[in-house]
Amino acid sequence: MDSVFSNVARAPEDPILGVTVAYNNDPSPVKINLGVGAYRTEEGKPLVLDVVRKAEQQLVNDPSRVKEYIPIVGISDFNKLSAKLILGADSPAITESRVTTVQCLSGTGSLRVGAEFLKTHYHQSVIYIPKPTWGNHPKVFNLAGLSVEYFRYYDPATRGLDFKGLLEDLGAAPSGAIVLLHACAHNPTGVDPTSEQWEQIRQLMRSKSLLPFFDSAYQGFASGSLDTDAQSVRTFVADGGECLIAQSYAKNMGLYGERVGALSIVCKSADVASKVESQVKLVVRPMYSSPPIHGASIVATILKSSDMYNNWTIELKEMADRIKSMRQQLFEAIQARGTPGDWSHIIKQIGMFTFTGLNKEQVEFMTKEFHIYMTSDGRISMAGLSSKTVPHLADAMHAAVTRLG
């Protein structure tokens, strides 16, 4: 007898996660995985931060800890500390109780909860997202019932920001449209606006009543400074206007598999923020009821303790500095080989990813001939590189450019 699901078509492999599947199936000893967005040590190993291990040990040793359900909005301390981390301790939004923060399932979950709330309670159902953006963004917003449009962001000719196109497209967006903004370390391009450009974006968006929805996946991971990487968000919050912010602790605390994140919604008044929170609860309750305890407890433990917080900032800067060092080493290795073209974008871009400018054919060539795995758009994770593997990557890029043009 046929299955009632026999007509279900096989879904395509996720383009990013599929890179790792292909990498795992390759027996080559020289293979490199530059596809996945997770930090690796110089030895190519996953890293658990020392401060995270200490926090976990502290939690394990606490006999008063139980495994009861937590509130729909999550752990109160975690929410307060997360808002403080992204907005700044002295933010008027916090002191005036104009922000509601809800613990969610990492960045993706925070985006989805925010999108579901907006679909029901906001007068516009169109969201503008940068072209290109993280591959999951359009799916998250479409499945929440929002209509996705794109605004120009990256200029392949300069391998930098298409600022003119960005302003034109947002200027042409309907009044009140939602706009997704990467708070820092734009994924996949590594290209961020300058602080002056952010101010122009803010002025334009406020003049058209466009609603900012920030995705902050890399705070502290881009520049090495938590405050510097939050400046774009704080610029918008400082004007008293409203916005949404999705936070993730996957990258900056290395808590990838713990799924720890937060959604903050900054409102015009404490009364509105309270009503908004009551409705966000109605989004969460039928979706996953309440969030998990462990990861958020780790984050709250670290953010509450001045010693642990300081240790975290040191480890975070070490990760950011290693990525910057990989950029420099790769740039110098390409220069040394005399590879045609201007490769300065490798050291100008910021954060975990570099948008190399390599095309699909060149990427396929590098995978086949050199066992280097990356997404077909030419994005490479700098965190997956080491001093030992940079020469092999530079050789592959040189061969791809010189042989295929």
Curated annotation (Swiss-Prot):
Modified sites of kind N-acetylmethionine: 1
Effect of residue 71 to L: In aat2-2; loss of activity and growth defect when grown in vitro
Domain of life: Eukaryota
Result for mutant: residue 254 to R: In aat2-1; loss of activity
InterPro entries documented for this protein: Aminotransferase_I/II_large, Asp_trans, NHTrfase_class1_PyrdxlP-BS, PyrdxlP-dep_Trfase, PyrdxlP-dep_Trfase_major, PyrdxlP-dep_Trfase_small
Pfam families membership: Aminotran_1_2
Keyword entries, A-Z: Acetylation, Aminotransferase, Cytoplasm, Pyridoxal phosphate, Transferase
GO molecular-function term, one example from the UniProt record: L-aspartate:2-oxoglutarate aminotransferase activity
Result after altering residue 292 to L: In asp2-11; loss of pyridoxal phosphate binding and loss of activity
Phenotype for residue 258 to K: In asp2-13; loss of pyridoxal phosphate binding and loss of activity
Positions with a binding annotation for L-aspartate: 37, 134, 187, 379
Outcome recorded upon mutating residue 46 to L: In aat2-4; loss of activity
One CC-aspect GO term: plastid
Top-level EC class as recorded in UniProt: transferase
UniProt induction comment: Up-regulated upon pathogen infection.
EC number(s) reported in the record: 2.6.1.1
Subcellular location: Cytoplasm
Catalysis performed (reactions): L-aspartate + 2-oxoglutarate = oxaloacetate + L-glutamate
Cofactor(s) in the UniProt record: pyridoxal 5'-phosphate
Family of this protein: Belongs to the class-I pyridoxal-phosphate-dependent aminotransferase family.
Protein task: Important for the metabolism of amino acids and Krebs-cycle related organic acids. Involved in plant nitrogen metabolism of Asp and Asp-derived amino acids and in the synthesis of Asp/Asn for seed storage. May be involved in the assessment of the pyridoxal phosphate levels in the cell.
Remarks, miscellaneous: Several mutations in ASP2, but not all, suppress the root UV-B sensitive (rus) phenotype. A loss of ASP2 activity is not sufficient for this suppression. In eukaryotes there are cytoplasmic, mitochondrial and chloroplastic isozymes.
Protein name (database record): Aspartate aminotransferase, cytoplasmic isozyme 1
